[in-house]
Amino acid sequence: METKDKKEKGHMVLNSDNVFGSVSSSPTTTIQNPNYFTSFENPNFPYIFPKEEYEVMSKIESGSGKSTGSGHDPVENTAIEQEPPAAKKKRYHRHTASQIQQMEALFKENAHPDTKTRLRLSKKLGLSPIQVKFWFQNKRTQIKAQQSRSDNAKLKAENETLKTESQNIQSNFQCLFCSTCGHNLRLENARLRQELDRLRSIVSMRNPSPSQEITPETNKNNNDNMLIAEEEKAIDMELAVSCARELAKMCDINEPLWNKKRLDNESVCLNEEEYKKMFLWPLMNDDDRFRREASRANAVIMLNCITLVKAFLDADKWSEMFFPIVSSAKTAQIISSGASGPSGTLLLMFAELQVVSPLVPTREAYFLRYVEQNAEEGKWMVVDFPIDRIKPASATTTDQYRRKPSGCIIQAMRNGYSQVTWVEHVEVEEKHVQDEVVREFVESGVAFGAERWLSVLKRQCERMASLMATNITDLGVIPSVEARKNLMKLSQRMVKTFCLNIINSHGQAPTKDTVKIVSRKVCGGLVPCAVSVTLLPYSHQQVFDLLRDNQRLSQLEILFMGSSFQEVAHIANGSHLGNSISLLRINVESNSSHNVELMLQETCTDNSGSLLVYSTVDPVAVQLAMNGEDPSEIPLLPVGFSVVPVNPSDGVEGSSVSSPSCLLTVAIQVLGSNVTTERLDLSTVSVINHRICATVNRITSALVNDVGN
């Protein structure tokens, strides 16, 4: 037995004789090595041992070194003696290829089998459930480790590729070279600027006359180089955020920052002392040459806030929406674009602001425009602030006009409308307006105030709603929605041209009750334009009601010269009856179907003033526009009237005019035939002057008669 045990891999085999002693031993027989199990008081056997061996070892350990072969349990001793030698049991079981194959097949279908599945598989393979469980656990660990090693290898390869690409890009940047300019483009630009300045100085020395006229276009071109440098953009963003906070406070705070006017107790005026205490801005530009204008107003408009915000960020859309105020606008530079929308956008813009009267000078300025969204409150903020905190004012403005933090806060409403709070805050150098009434009107802040901006915005939003509507009545002549849109676009171009003819006429502005005649070149000759401004002691609504009555105008021979007319198309532009577009057929009795004269008419009014504009149009061109053709090429010669109230309902304390008054501007154009010279002859000037004076006299007489009756 000993020889056989020694051959068994050189291991010592334990049996009942050499471990527990003989069965016939005396109960008092002591174990020769009583401390044999002492070193295994807390055995840490691996779980790979079979369950039967683990139980036997547990029993041995619980005996605390005493012999279990005492003879008191012969059945137990007999079982132990009959048990095969422990060394013959395989402690590590290697699965067969068939077992592994079947377990791998199940692993592909289900890597996490439940207890029943493992029990069924163990019976099928002749393994214990714990062996099956551990095999699946080890297999999952092995697969996870393989995937981890594979992913690490891929990441290392990708990292090496990125490092190589980065090194190549850096080396390419170091080798960049412009073949066109040879790295001398900035030097060349600096040299050209110096040359331009030198030429300007030469021209100014040769033409020192102070009366030399500089057109607005020239000034705009001179300011094109006033762009924001890269190192100044961070400062601009900080200023934008600060100005947005200032605008928010000016919109929210009432007294003592804003005091109610004593005349109507509704309009408010800015308390300059409180403003200086609350904000540091005026302390940095405290110049006595500048007069400050500040106003605030609220209104609900028929437009959603997103569309309105996008219009503020597009110079063309902005000038089109506010064309009675903004005669021209452009975006000079995009300093910052919003990350995910308009919010955070910062623009450098230029604008020329106007009142539709040649007696009121225009205002031009470069300024920064910033847009910010408060998503929690559903608000958008559009704030303008001057650029001259970074650059000198003389280099950025042409008429010493600065827009202090101004703009609007737009609150979205559930019905798609928007609640707009507008603040207009500017600094203007004193202008010498010849007429005292007009000077008081401008200095009151009403001419360019917040109420005028909101009045124009409300009317333009109603016009846009009419443009998009499909249920507007048009007397049944306009065949389609597209035809109505084309007619409205043609009419809008007519009104804008009329306003530009009044504002952009060169030379000194006319005085009150005088006629100014200018001309402009067109293909084939000159078009004389006569402008007259008259102060009427009547409210602008009275004058507007008279002028929009075409029957009265025909009787007074003001516009139609006594001719009969018929309205063939009518488009309502808003809730007010005075906001409409009409297509009139002139000389109905004498016209045949082959000889039709048409006149396009648009009238618009709000609290800030009224416009009545007319122009004859070619019937063939109108028909093409009705059929969907582009109306932008149809020639127009607009004539009409502009009525501006010089003392609005809120009034101005200390005004020299106590009764309602308004400025009536009459502008007419005549297409001169076969006029090829650059100057108008005296006969043409005399005819135009007589016609416009007669028109003003008839209007004045009609108003006197209406008041007398």
UniProtKB/Swiss-Prot annotation:
Q: Does the keyword Nucleus apply?
A: yes
Question: So what family is this one in?
Answer: Belongs to the HD-ZIP homeobox family. Class IV subfamily.
Protein name according to UniProt: Homeobox-leucine zipper protein HDG4
Q: What does this protein do?
A: Probable transcription factor.
Q: What are the protein's GO molecular function terms?
A: DNA binding; DNA-binding transcription factor activity; DNA-binding transcription factor activity, RNA polymerase II-specific; lipid binding
Q: Which residues form the START domain?
A: 229-466
Regarding tissue, the record states: Expressed in flowers.
UniProt xrefs under SUPFAM superfamilies: Bet v1-like (SSF55961), Homeodomain-like (SSF46689)
InterPro entries for this protein: GLABRA2/ANL2/PDF2/ATML1-like (IPR042160), HD (IPR001356), Homeobox_CS (IPR017970), Homeodomain-like_sf (IPR009057), START_lipid-bd_dom (IPR002913)
Could you tell me which Gene3D superfamilies the record lists for this protein?
Homeodomain-like
User: Which key words are in the record?
Assistant: Coiled coil, DNA-binding, Homeobox, Nucleus, Transcription, Transcription regulation
Q: Which domain of life is it from?
A: Eukaryota
Q: Which residues bind DNA?
A: 88-147
Tell me the PANTHER family matching this sequence: HOMEOBOX-LEUCINE ZIPPER PROTEIN HDG4 (PTHR45654:SF44), HOMEOBOX-LEUCINE ZIPPER PROTEIN MERISTEM L1 (PTHR45654)
- Annotated source species: Arabidopsis thaliana
Location relative to the cell: Nucleus
Instruction: List, alphabetically, the GO terms of the cellular component aspect.
Output: nucleus
Coiled-coil spans in chain: 137-205
Pfam families in the cross-refs? Homeodomain, START
Region Disordered: list its residue ranges: 61-92
